[in-house]
């Protein structure tokens, strides 16, 4: 589908008339999100990848952290197809873990640590 062509579901979406020259669709590569980040890191080594509370991580450092986390998960026995629950606040380490799991083919199930106990129990049961 061309970027400027609407699919049948979009033809009844009146807000699209206000998009102007903005494409209706973006083309994305058929790769994992971790692979997309790693490819970007090849080109943008020293460019800021994450900025958090005054600390900036370059793409080079991001890849190092992803690789370290991935090695740790593999050492724990995590493998492709596994689902791993991560209960962390929105900090860089949560990002490293998510990409690391994606890189090894596992799935990150992210839970916000301020969720109620009943919600956390529900989420943990859902991922089994």
Locations of regions flagged by a protein language model:
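Flexible, non-catalytic linker and terminal segments flanking ANL/adenylate-forming cores
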Residues: 1-30
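Structural core segment of the AMP-binding/adenylate-forming
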Residues: 1-4, 76, 103-128
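Generic hydrophobic, helix-prone segments enriched in Leu/Val/Ile
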Residues: 6-16, 53-56, 110, 115
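Residue-level signal for pocket-adjacent positions within structured domains
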Residues: 19-23, 45, 106-109
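Conserved AMP-binding/adenylate-forming core of the ANL superfamily
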Residues: 27-30, 38, 46-99, 116-121
